[in-house]
Amino acid sequence: ATIEVYNILPYYYYVSKAWSWNGN
């Protein structure tokens, strides 16, 4: 379970950053 979270954590962070950079 922890491995899964650690695997998606960076992806989620990147998506969030991209969204903010998009002007949202």
From Swiss-Prot:
GO terms for cellular component: extracellular region. Keywords: Cell wall, Secreted. It is found in: Secreted, Cell wall. This is 47 kDa cell wall protein.
